[in-house]
UniProtKB/Swiss-Prot annotation:
Coiled coil: 324-351
Biased composition range(s): Polar residues: 69-83, 295-310
Top-level taxon of origin: Eukaryota
Annotated gene: BEND4
Pfam families: BEN
Record organism: Homo sapiens (Human)
Biased composition (Low complexity): 91-109
Domain BEN residue range list: 390-498
Organism ancestry: Eukaryota, Metazoa, Chordata, Craniata, Vertebrata
Molecular function terms, GO-annotated: DNA binding
UniProt-recorded name of the protein: BEN domain-containing protein 4
Disulfide bond positions: none
Alphabetically ordered keywords of this record: Coiled coil
Length: 534
């Protein structure tokens, strides 16, 4: 044991480290009883350490870190010497993975938060642990180099790497689907998710310091006690680290779903990730560095996601763009805002009139109101009925009952009664009917100028007759010419001194049927000669 500790303290020289590895390759403690335990808890130690570069860039608050696997046979302070002794690149990963002193894996350019650190056991499954570390960092070159560093063959390590990658992808997809169902669009997630991630990072940092102490303690225990105590210690550490790994993995998946959909790299393309160790860790965005288990792609684009992309492609398309109608409404809102600004500027530029101008306008309005003759408006009396909603024309319920009962379901008779109730005798007598014909100049008639009937009342009566006959199909609807004829007849009878509609009662056979066209024509001709015809 002293011979093994001496070259470890001298420095990370590759030949000595490789020679010291050989006794551990031969020693197989409990080969028949604990193979499943070794496979289950065979995990590399992944600790967040900054890049050792010349000159080293200052890391951000949640700085991208390099994943370094620590062995229990050497104290951690010499890890930096081991890492700095190799040039950056895939060669450094191959040289570091083939040693039993800290096997340093190069950091990815994204620097996402990795799994918690756990020291690999001194067991024959070193190839599986190093290949798993290469799988987690999505570095095919590192996976191959880690496979060559163990005692197993290259084919076995490659098969394990592919199997681990397949298991990771399947597990990530299933976790993302379950979390998306549980989240329900993020409603069930707590708002302090980022704080939980920060606290998780702090816990990882403290656990790393504890693991350094464990490494020092493990060194003494390994040299003084038996292998059983060492295995029990490692078993307890692996148990704690496995639970921490699952917790960080779940938080990382939640943060991945919250931060947006990013394409996961295709494991088959090795050329994309050959230069990951040389990329500046500061080139990543804070969203990605807080994402935990996310993709190494630094681009924010959503194009060409691989088969292991966590969200569905339909969700990406929905989040990508708006519908054309939304874009039109957006532009319309912008144009309206600009128009409002222009109108506001114009309103502010208009000068306010002085008090003299305001007093003058007020005096003009008062004088105009004094000259106006207030016209008596048709105020609705008690129990009155409005013919149409849009017209201020009213009749009493008694008048309406009389008109309906006496019309015998004839639209012309109903119109005659309504004219009698709406217009007064003077309005009909001193009017020129509907105003469609001019007075005859040859008649030489002198007298007051005659004006047409109130167009509002005339229009209201026309519309009401049409509506009433349409809603009651058993009523006979008059034509436009017949409606005009009824108005002209009412004006003519008012000029003759008879009440409008008295002829309907006194001369019972005067308007009883349609066969009396001769009498109607005589009345029309007489009214036309007087100049009051339609």
């Amino acid at each position: 044991m002293e011979e093994e500790m001496q070259p470890a303290e001298e420095g990370p020289s590759v030949p000595k480290i490789y020679k010291q590895r050989s006794p551990y390759s031969v020693l197989k403690t409990f080969p028949s009883k604990r193979p499943a335990l070794a496979k289950r808890y065979e995990r590399p130690t992944l600790v967040e350490l900054p890049h050792v570069r010349a000159p080293p860039p200052p890391p951000p608050p949640f700085a991208p870190h390099a994943a370094v696997s620590i062995s229990s046979s050497e104290p951690p302070p010499q890890q930096f010497q081991a890492q700095s002794s190799y040039p950056p690149g895939p060669g450094r990963a191959a040289a570091a993975a083939s040693s039993s002193s800290p096997s340093c894996t190069p950091a990815t350019s994204q620097g996402h938060l990795r799994t918690p650190a756990q020291p690999p056991p001194a067991s024959p499954a070193a190839s599986s642990s190093s290949s798993f570390a290469a799988v987690v960092r999505y570095g095919p070159g590192a996976a191959a180099a880690a496979g060559t560093g163990g005692t197993g063959s290259d084919s076995a390590s490659l098969e394990l790497s592919a199997e681990s990658r397949m298991i990771l992808d399947a597990f990530a997809q299933q976790c993302s689907r379950v979390l998306s169902l549980l989240n329900c669009g993020g409603k069930l997630l707590d708002s302090n998710h980022s704080q939980s991630m920060i606290s998780c990072v702090k816990q990882e940092g403290s656990s790393y310091n504890e693991r350094q102490e464990h490494c020092h303690i493990g060194k003494g225990v390994h040299s003084q006690t038996s292998d059983n105590v060492d295995i029990e210690m490692q078993y307890m550490q692996r148990k704690q680290q496995t639970s921490a790994f699952l917790r960080v993995f779940t938080d990382s998946l939640q943060n991945y779903l919250l931060s947006g959909s990013f394409p996961t790299p295709n494991p088959s393309s090795a050329s994309e990730y050959g230069h990951l160790a040389d990329v500046d860790p500061l080139s990543t965005s804070p969203v990605h560095t807080l994402g935990g288990w996310t993709s190494p792609a630094t681009s924010e684009s959503h194009g060409h996601p691989s088969s292991s992309t966590l969200p569905e492609e339909e969700e990406e398309e929905d989040e990508e763009g708006y519908c054309p109608r939304c874009q039109e409404l957006e532009q319309e809102v912008i144009s309206l805002q600009q128009e409002n600004e222009e109108l506001r500027r114009k309103l502010e530029s208009i000068p306010v009139p002085c008090q003299t101008v305001l007093d003058y306008l007020k005096m003009v309005l008062q004088h105009h109101n004094q000259l106006l003759i207030p016209q008596p408006a048709d105020q609705p009396t008690e129990g009155s009925k409005q013919l149409l909603n849009n017209y201020p024309v009213y009749i009493t319920s008694k008048q309406w009952d009389e008109a309906v009962n006496s019309s015998k379901k004839d639209g012309r008779r109903l119109l005659r009664y309504l004219i009698r109730f709406v217009f007064t005798t003077d309005e009909l007598k001193y009017s020129c009917g509907l105003g469609k014909r001019k007075r005859s100049v040859q008649s030489g008639e002198t007298g007051p100028e005659r004006r047409p009937l109130d167009p509002v009342k005339v229009t209201c009566l026309r519309e009401f007759i049409r509506m009433h006959c349409t809603s009651n199909p058993d009523w006979w609807m008059p034509s436009e010419e017949q409606i005009n004829k009824v108005f002209s007849d009412a004006v003519g009878h008012a000029r003759q001194g008879r009440a409008v509609g008295t002829f309907l009662h006194n001369g019972g056979s005067f308007y009883e049927g349609i066969d009396h066209q001769a009498s109607q024509d005589e009345v029309f001709n007489k009214s036309s000669q007087d100049g009051s015809g339609d």
